[in-house]
A protein has these predicted regions:
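Short, glycine- and charge-enriched coil/turn segments that flank and shape catalytic ligand pockets
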Residues: 33, 403-404
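Generic detector of short, locally flexible boundary/turn motifs and exposed helical patches
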Residues: 68-71, 149-154, 179-181, 203, ...
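Aromatic- and carboxylate-lined catalytic core of secreted/periplasmic carbohydrate-active enzymes
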Residues: 265-399, 406-422
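Hydrophobic side chains in beta-strands
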Residues: 30, 188, 217, 242, ...
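Glycoside hydrolase catalytic-domain groove-lining segments
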Residues: 196-303
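A structural signal for alpha-helix termini and helix-coil/disorder junctions
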Residues: 180, 242, 340-343
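Active-site mouth of glycoside hydrolases
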Residues: 1-239, 248
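Residue-level marker of positions within ordered structural domains that often coincide
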Residues: 179, 191, 245, 320, ...
Length: 422
């Protein structure tokens, strides 16, 4: 917003970082806007009548050329020139966020521009009507049912040299701008349902950049699994992002296919996604942590609202990262848990989740009102603490327990955290 700063206007970067720290927000998930300014909010698909733009603005990654007229009646974009204001703002955010250990999850693409609602393609810089670079997308755009757009097949077609060239330029710009930062995780995009060959191309382009920080694999399950089974490309992945698929509560798998030119919402109209449970989310995270122990796993898929923050604790207890669990200031729970591993033989996904390490300690989420622990191989004596899973506060100090046998500990309330500390 020109001349105005604040929430919903032009964000002050230092204020944004301070807000994140104050509210224990670790990650900022960012992608570029669906259009430059607000006139397109009506979702009409016609060229605007004039250039009387409506603020606030969503700056695009590309600069204007000063030539011709795009669909918003401003000059067309030049995809060879990157918008310095846009990239400097992102770079500045990461510079400041790095000081507090925060993370930018950098989505390179916003697939909503090319699939589903046609209005988002109207002003998109890659549309032939909006740039001077001759990418070869047909004009006029044909909207299905006078509304929908299906440009994914053409957009992801890297067999065309011009498309491959401009994707390569954009991907490398998206990575290289952060070459001296730490707190960046690169993702192809939170809604990506595209094909395997484009995902592999994206990974190769990111990997070709020096100091490219961490790389998240965000895709449909078939594409994820193909990448992870491929020795060449799995080595380019640091984080597995479970987002486009899930296990249903009944144990069946919901897995839309990649590369069929459908958005997630469109898949969900063809196949019933069903509902998840804490146990099914735990299962998904644990499965991929076991298969790929050298990679972090984050879960951003379907969830349900459950009491006592159980869904996020399921993610954490299964070994997942970036779970939305509270700080625990009174005890070194997370410091100790960094050396723990989930203990499958002590975990019943419907009643309790347990992690720990012999001689170091244990952490358990007790779904009901007790937790069963097998300490047969552990001779240490541990102090017992019960913790509120919503607030992170200690609700009870419960004496001590000695290893060497099996113990049953009664929780002060259902769905409590049990921490055994040396």
């Amino acid at each position: 917003m020109p001349g105005r700063e604040g929430l919903g206007l032009t964000d002050r970067i230092d204020s944004t970082v301070n807000y994140m720290v104050k509210n224990q927000i670790l990650v900022l998930d960012h992608n570029y806007g669906l259009w430059y300014e607000r006139r397109r909010n009506d979702h009409e698909r016609n060229m605007h009548a004039d250039a009387e733009v409506w603020a606030p603005f969503n700056e695009m990654p590309y600069s204007r050329s000063g030539q011709g007229e795009a669909q918003d009646r401003l000059s067309k974009y030049d995809l060879n020139k990157f918008n310095p204001w846009y990239w400097n703002r992102l770079k500045r955010f990461v510079d400041v966020a790095d000081r507090d250990g925060l993370v930018l999850l950098h989505d390179h693409y916003n697939q909503h521009n090319i699939i589903e609602e046609g209005a988002h393609w109207c002003d998109y810089p890659w549309r032939s009507a909006n740039n001077i670079n001759q990418l070869g997308f047909a004009e006029k755009t044909v909207f299905s049912g006078d509304k929908r757009v299906y440009m994914a097949e053409q957009f992801y077609d890297i067999t065309r040299p011009v498309i491959r060239e401009y994707h390569s330029k954009f991907i490398r710009q998206s990575v290289n701008v952060f070459h001296d930062n730490n707190g960046v995780v690169h993702s192809i995009g939170l809604e990506y349902t595209g094909p395997l060959n484009f995902m592999n191309f994206w990974l190769e382009e990111v990997n070709a950049c020096d100091n490219h920080q961490l790389v998240a694999l965000t895709a449909t399950k078939d594409v994820q699994d193909s990448v992870l089974k491929d020795k060449k490309h799995t080595s380019m992945v640091d984080v597995i992002d479970i987002r486009q698929w899930h296990y249903r509560a009944d144990g069946t798998l919901y897995e839309p296919q990649g590369g069929v030119s459908l958005a997630l919402r469109q898949h969900a109209r063809l196949i019933d996604p069903g509902t998840v449970s804490c146990a099914s989310v735990y299962r998904a995270v644990r499965e991929y942590r076991c298969k790929y122990p050298d990679k972090a796993v984050v879960y951003n898929g379907s969830t349900i609202r459950v009491p006592r923050n159980a869904m996020n604790w399921a993610i954490f207890m299964a070994g997942g990262s970036f779970a939305k669990i509270p700080p625990i200031d009174e005890l070194p729970v997370y410091e100790k848990a960094s050396s723990f591993s989930p203990i499958d033989r002590q975990t019943d996904m419907d009643t309790q989740w347990v992690m720990g390490a012999v001689g170091k300690g244990y952490l358990g989420y007790c779904v009901k009102n007790e937790i069963n622990l097998d300490l047969m191989g552990d001779r240490e004596t541990y102090k017992v603490f019960w913790i509120d899973p919503d607030k992170g506060t200690v609700i009870k100090e419960d004496g001590s327990v000695r290893g060497g046998g099996k113990v049953i500990l009664k929780a002060p309330a259902e769905s409590s955290i049990c921490f055994l500390q040396l």
